[in-house]
UniProtKB/Swiss-Prot annotation:
Job of this protein: May catalyze the synthesis of indole-3-acetic acid (IAA)-amino acid conjugates, providing a mechanism for the plant to cope with the presence of excess auxin.
A Gene Ontology term for the protein's cellular component: cytoplasm
Phylogenetic classification of the source organism: Eukaryota, Viridiplantae, Streptophyta, Embryophyta, Tracheophyta
Keyword Plastid: no
Enzyme class at the top of the EC tree: ligase
Position of the signal peptide: none
UniProt xrefs under Pfam families: GH3, GH3_C, GH3_M
InterPro entries with a match to the protein in the record: GH3, GH3_C, GH3_M
One Gene Ontology term from the biological process aspect of the record: response to auxin
GO molecular function, one term: acid-amino acid ligase activity
Tissue: Expressed in etiolated and green seedlings, roots, callus and highly in flowers.
Record flagged with keyword Nucleotide-binding: no
Protein name in UniProt: Probable indole-3-acetic acid-amido synthetase GH3.11
Amino acid sequence: MDDHNLDYKGSGALEELEMLTVNAKEAQELILTKILERNQATEYLSKFMNGSTNISAFKRHVPVVTYDKVHPYILRIATGEESSILCGEYILELLRSSGTSRGEPRLMPSILKDLDRRTYLYSLIMPIMNKYISGLGEGKAMYLLFVKAETLTDSGIPVRSVLTSYYKSPHFLHRKHDLYNNYTSPDEVILCPDSQQSMYCQLLCGLVERQHVLRIGAVFASAFLRSISFLEQHWRDLVNDIRIGQLNSSITSPACRLAMLNFLALPNPELADQVEAICSCGSWKGILGRLWPNVKYIEAVLTGTMAQYIPMLEFYGGGAIPFVCTMYASSESYFGVNLSPLCSPADVSYTILPNMAYFEFIPLEDGLRLTDHEEVIENDKLVSLVDVKVGCYYELVVTTFSGLYRYRVGDVLQVTGFYNRAPQFKFICRRNVILSIDSDKTNEEDLHNSVTTAKKILENQNYLLLEYTSYTDISTVPGHYVLFWEIKSTHDERPAPLDAQLLESCCAAVEESLDYVYRRCRAHDRSIGPLEIRLVEAGAFDALMDLLVSHGSSINQYKTPRCIESSLALKLLNSKVIACFFSPQDPECGM
């Protein structure tokens, strides 16, 4: 990583990637050695290593930990103690995780060199894409990118999301505007902390540049679809701005208004007529290809529970625009890239880059039987990066330069193969998103698979499931699972009635698809009541996102929580319920 910028490096980047993956074992040993050398004097490592930088000693003595063990050190730094209690370098900022998997945001330490590592990974994306799609340098990218307002700790350390950190960094703002980093959105609009004003302006830029746009997307599919939903609601205002050459008065950000002058220098009634004709045609099926006729692909994270959004993307894309998932990253570290970006989202595997951090893996020996959040993991159970086995499931553990040592990220991965000596992983689920009433334990993937089975019943009746989440309602005896569903018609003509029998059959289908323990508790032990679907009004999940973003989540990193833990979020969703349906029968339990 000698050249830490976003300049397009072409085949040179791929040659470097080849060398890196061929020498994955050596790269990992070098990374860990450097981490130990730079951080050997920290209070945290000194407790276990006594100043040693020996790799074997690290593996014997440094424990595997969850956030609860790291949090006290981060709080001490946040309130004014030296970074050296955790990290040998100055902690530049604390990165706020999305906070939607466990309720409260987690704060991850970050140092200046972390930006180099993130930029290195970003610099690989376009060389990889150019292997599969030609002509990407001949147009622009409409990437809908957002920042979140940051806060300061008592000691003055910025607290921000990892993406806000990157978009505000010199690495992004001082990038050379070459052919492959040519975005429709001005930086000033991306950096607007008001996501509604930013979204409006970014969509307006994309419409003005519609003939030049070759790539569209956002970080997560949820953010992209939220933007398209926003476009459905506001296209008339956007068309009017284009027609008269003036920005809507609702945009009050001075930076946004100044940046948009170049896009609305003159009235453009011809373009306004084109966009109006497309947006007013009735059905929005396939509208992305009509609004941006030269688009070659949609880029967003569509793995894990983001796969929920594929049907809606297919609806808006008309089934004609490929989906691309390019990278795997989190607030803790950036991890890897997808070397086969045009594969089906269901087949996406990420090649771990061995120069990002030091990676270890907790084997999940019983398939997806997840280790308990508080379970003590014996050090000798961990497997190194190059020693994982194809087909096996693991929980990811990282050691970083910035002060995370053998930290359980919480992601469950399955090894799908190797690229040279670097393993390739499929993202399966987050460890701690579960529903449980009795002896049942339903994880995120179990829930996703069950909902996927049930939603086919809706699709056969010309409905799409837009969003869902869940919680365990123990106000009843026995307690039961509750699913909140938001549904949209996909048919130009009048769809089949959305009656009780249809939703009850969905309840039954979810239950039949859940595991044996759940079905036994329901049908035999009677320790779980019938599953309930609460249908919510249109826009309920947008309101949920607004609530969670207002409480610290980043709009870029936001993912709909698949299990609601916040009482405020639960109250909001219950206020949006328009009908309730229960499973009409016991599931089969084979007893």
